C-alpha cells in the first residue's frame, strides 16, 4: 500500500523541526546559515522551520552576529522563559522544591522539614501488618499534602509565559516503576504509593517521578560536575545512600528500571539489620544516618551541628566524619571496580562535609581499587551541593516537554 505523500511530508517536517530545535538548544547563539551547515538541511527549509519556532515562542532573534564580509547574520537563541518547570527532591526528612525556566535557571526555591509519623519515628515494632500498612499510608498522605503545598507555592511564583508550567519532576528515595508508582521506599517506609497519578490528577500537568539518585545524576550531568563526562556514577549520601549510573552519557536504569540501589550492597556479611530486609547494607555504615547515630554519643543531633564543630577543629567530630569517609570510600571502591567510570560524584547533604570526607574516601579508594581502574578515575563532590536532585527533577519535566514538542504533540 502506498503511503500518502502528505503524511510523509508532515512526518518529515516534524523530524526536521526537532533537528533544528536541537541545534538551537545545543549551539545557540547561531545563525540560520550555521544551522544549515550543522544539520545538512537546505537554507530555505531552515528559514521556514526557524520561523515556525519563532511563531511558537521557542526561538528568539537576538540581533546581528559577526561577519567576515557582507551582511551580518541574525543570531538565534532558545527562549528559556517560554515556560517553567517545578522540581522536587522528596527526602526522608525534608522537601526541597525549585522553580526553573526551560534553561534550568533558578527562579524560586524553598525547603521544608518533613515530619514522619510519630510512632514510626520512635521505631515502634508493629507486629500487625495491617496496622503497619495503615501507618505507612497515613505517613504518605501527610507527606503528599506537604508536597502538594510546596508545588502550589512554586507555581504561584512563575512569571507569565506562553507555555506556563510545562511539568513537574519529583525525585524520591526509593524504587519507582514506569507509571510513577513508588513500589518501595525503605527509609520512608512507603510501599505502592501512586505518586505520579495523584499529582497529575491534582495539577493537570505532566509529572515525572524517578529515584532521587537518578535525578541527582541527571542534575550533575546537565548543570554540575558531570557536564561533558561520558561515564559517571553519582553517589547520593543522605539519610540513606543511592546511586545514579550514567554510561556513555545515558542514564542506566536496568531491565526493570530499578538499578542503582547500591546503598543496599552488603559490606558486612552478618552486619546490622536494614529496613530493606537485608543485613550489613553499605548505607548503615556510610550515610548521614550512620554519622548521626554515632554522633549522638558525643551529644550532637544534626549534621549542621557536626559541620559547625568540625569547622571549629573539634578533633572528635573530625575523626568521626573521617571514619564515615572510610566506609564511604570502601563502597565507592566496589563501584569503581565494577563500572570503571571516569568520575564518581558524591552528592546530597553529606557533600557539605567534603573537606573532611575527601582524604578518607580517597585513601580507601586508592587502597581498595584495582590499579588500572583508578588510573584516570577522579572522585568529585557535587558542584550543585545538595541541590543536584531537585535540579535533575526539574530537568526531567523540561526534557519531557521537549520530547513532546519534537514529536509534534
For each of these PLM feature ranges, what is it?
Residues 1-123, 127-164, 203, 269-273, ...:
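ATP-binding/phosphotransfer module of carbohydrate and carboxylate kinases, centering on a glycine-rich
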Residues 88-90, 102, 166-284, 289-292, ...:
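Phosphate-binding/catalytic loop of phosphoryl-transfer enzymes
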Amino acid at each position: 500500500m502506498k503511503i500518502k505523500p502528505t503524511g510523509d511530508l508532515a512526518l518529515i517536517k516534524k523530524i526536521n523541526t526537532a533537528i533544528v530545535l536541537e541545534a538551537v538548544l545545543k549551539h545557540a547563539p547561531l545563525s540560520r546559515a550555521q544551522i544549515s551547515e550543522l544539520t545538512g538541511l537546505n537554507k530555505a527549509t531552515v528559514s521556514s522551520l526557524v520561523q515556525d519556532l519563532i511563531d511558537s515562542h521557542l526561538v528568539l532573534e537576538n540581533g546581528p552576529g559577526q561577519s567576515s564580509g557582507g551582511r551580518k547574520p541574525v543570531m538565534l537563541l532558545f527562549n528559556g522563559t517560554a515556560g517553567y518547570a517545578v522540581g522536587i527532591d522528596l527526602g526522608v526528612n525534608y522537601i526541597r522544591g525549585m522553580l526553573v525556566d526551560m534553561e534550568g535557571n533558578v527562579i524560586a526555591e524553598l525547603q521544608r522539614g518533613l515530619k514522619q509519623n510519630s510512632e514510626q519515628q520512635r521505631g515502634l515494632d508493629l507486629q500487625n501488618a495491617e496496622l503497619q500498612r495503615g501507618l505507612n499510608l497515613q505517613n504518605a498522605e501527610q507527606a503528599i499534602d506537604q508536597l502538594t503545598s510546596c508545588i502550589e507555592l512554586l507555581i504561584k511564583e512563575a512569571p507569565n509565559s506562553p507555555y506556563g508550567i510545562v511539568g513537574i519532576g519529583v525525585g524520591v528515595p526509593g524504587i519507582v516503576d514506569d507509571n510513577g508508582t513508588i513500589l518501595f521506599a525503605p527509609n520512608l517506609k512507603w510501599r505502592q504509593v501512586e505518586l505520579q497519578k495523584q499529582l497529575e490528577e491534582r495539577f493537570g500537568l505532566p509529572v515525572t517521578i524517578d529515584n532521587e539518585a537518578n535525578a541527582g545524576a541527571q542534575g550533575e550531568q546537565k548543570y554540575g560536575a558531570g557536564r561533558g563526562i561520558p561515564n559517571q556514577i553519582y553517589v547520593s549520601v543522605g539519610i540513606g545512600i543511592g546511586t545514579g549510573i550514567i554510561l556513555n552519557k545515558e542514564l542506566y536504569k536496568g531491565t526493570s528500571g530499578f538499578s542503582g540501589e547500591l546503598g543496599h550492597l552488603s559490606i558486612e556479611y552478618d552486619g546490622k539489620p536494614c529496613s530493606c530486609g537485608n543485613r550489613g547494607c553499605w548505607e548503615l555504615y556510610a550515610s548521614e544516618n550512620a554519622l548521626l547515630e554515632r554522633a549522638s554519643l558525643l551529644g550532637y543531633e544534626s549534621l549542621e551541628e557536626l559541620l559547625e564543630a568540625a569547622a571549629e577543629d573539634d578533633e572528635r567530630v573530625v575523626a568521626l566524619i573521617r571514619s564515615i569517609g572510610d566506609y564511604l570510600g570502601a563502597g565507592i571502591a566496589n563501584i569503581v571496580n565494577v563500572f570503571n567510570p571516569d568520575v564518581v560524584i558524591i552528592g546530597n547533604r553529606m557533600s557539605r562535609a567534603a573537606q573532611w570526607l575527601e582524604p578518607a574516601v580517597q585513601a580507601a579508594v586508592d587502597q581498595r581499587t584495582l590499579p588500572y581502574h583508578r588510573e584516570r578515575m577522579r572522585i568529585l563532590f557535587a558542584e550543585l551541593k545538595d541541590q543536584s536532585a531537585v535540579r535533575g527533577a526539574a530537568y526531567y519535566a523540561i526534557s519531557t516537554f521537549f520530547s513532546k514538542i519534537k514529536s509534534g504533540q
